[in-house]
């Protein structure tokens, strides 16, 4: 009955959204109608919904330009990388969930929680402050942020909702961007994620506030990003017995999701962090004429029309303000019969000589020909602009990061942790605090490609200094205090790349650490792309390769807490990773093939071990004697990955597939599912030629494997190490059905997730003992506002 009542509520919400959209479209068509002014002239009501005769809105009855460009920047050099705006209609619902657009992430159940990619080659390297890495859905790195240049002020509002006040999830995202002129732009973004949780002690909230600015002048370019984040996650340690989900009939009572017992209560992970990113450069070069884009031409015409209308209104106002019966004074030229006073100067004999530098117009035909040539030149000038071509750039990039983490617990089950190293709050309470401060400066000099026909590639050289500071608990006898560690690193490197042209692109970057904690580290990265025509279509061949020799990050080497402790700075070796990857895509058949081979030496990871007691009752104690440590595998690990992206289309029917095969040489150290499948079947059509509709369903499926467990005290995923308590996950189809629509730029959807929660083996876990949400209806909308 409860589920039926919620379904009725959701249906009412859907009807309300559709009615609102219909009403807004209907009223928009009624925005203007006739009115008669004091002079008897018939006009239309102003677009701002009033009859004010002094309204000076210069955008009335003219199309507001909606051109928008978005890009990301290279984190080291600040290079502009054009990208698509985040306004895509396709897979819009899936983009709002932290299990990924293609369902490729393992999570700890609720939306916005910690996650880890099942596709190993798509995982990112660990950051200096590892505790925020699992929140990659929420955290936006500087090289992932979308900078914006818009022809008119732009506001985007996105809202997603499911559930009710006890268990629901809400996401609200607002982004504003405006350009002062074609060079200077700024904006801000606010994001609030809140999931109350369908299971006990599972609420999570994130808040982000970001301010960004760009200046893209001829000689000076700058990108600035300031962001602050607050994250608070309630940790429940998973449910005490998986049978509550997989075999609920084995219990005498029926348990709602929020009644299933969990391991932990009153345990929290709190993170606060602040980030500043500034990349700027000074360019030395020259000017040349280039054609304008259609959007730039429209913007110029819009500005010209606005200026003319403003001048016309000013002239009309000038005439209306004159006294009645008295015409306004206007110059009418020289009066008839007027003579010039004084004597006419004598003519110089040299005036009779012909000026050979001037064009002689001696006939009407020649005058018409010159006028036509001038008209053609004026037409060309109207669509041309002057572009600055940089030759050399002086580059500086600054990154500043400030982190604080607090793991707080008021209750811990007896025997849950194996070890205890100190006590701060007394009893079983925990208050472990960690801080990290980082400043990185990169100075570079670049010789840019394309400033002449012989410069086919760009060259860059750079030097980087990085300062890192860490604070965490330490002990001296029985005294607990905050100890501080500092690190300084200096590295140098270079880059050669080719990004212009349509056929061949490549990029080779190398960096070597000269001094500091990370001395002797090495990073070599190479990628290339080749395009060529085949059967009247385009084949794209891309390849990537890298060799990284890096130290494990600070908290792998050293970590102190009340129940977990290690100092391995003298024991861990540098981790070496080598990967070669190829991509082949052919747009005619909608096919893309990705193949990667990777070898890892000294693979460093977290291992987690505990005893799992299960007596089959509601009072089952769950995990006990938990311990987590850092492990390093001495032998080489090899990983093979093959991905097939294949799309089919037959009329309105579309079928998209991503099939991933992975093979690890050591599943005990690096477990991955052998197969991971995402499939999306939907109908794509229009209603009344204005409403775009995608109606269908998608499924995510992966084969059984020993997925990484999750440790709340560390906020990290860790490999299962106790043979007696290991569990396998997988072989459950996660099916979602949806109606995804777009109307005049407004995107909205209705989705029912995990449709098969009561079918099959009911093994809807992606992390051991953390079930995913059951069947839930989601609704969301994204609305753009221009001007």
Task: State where each predicted segment sits.
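Bacterial Sec-dependent N-terminal signal peptides
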Residues: 1-38, 739, 751, 774-787
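Generic low-polarity alpha-helical segments
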Residues: 1-4, 11-15, 24, 28-30, ...
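Intrinsically disordered, low-complexity segments
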Residues: 22, 27-30, 354, 361, ...
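Membrane-proximal, glycine/serine-rich, low-complexity loop/turn segments characteristic
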Residues: 30-277, 281-352, 356, 533-538, ...
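Exposed, low-structure sequence patches enriched in small/polar residues
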Residues: 16, 150-152, 226, 260-334, ...
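A generic structural signal for short coil/turn motifs at secondary-structure boundaries
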Residues: 7, 164, 196-200, 515-517, ...
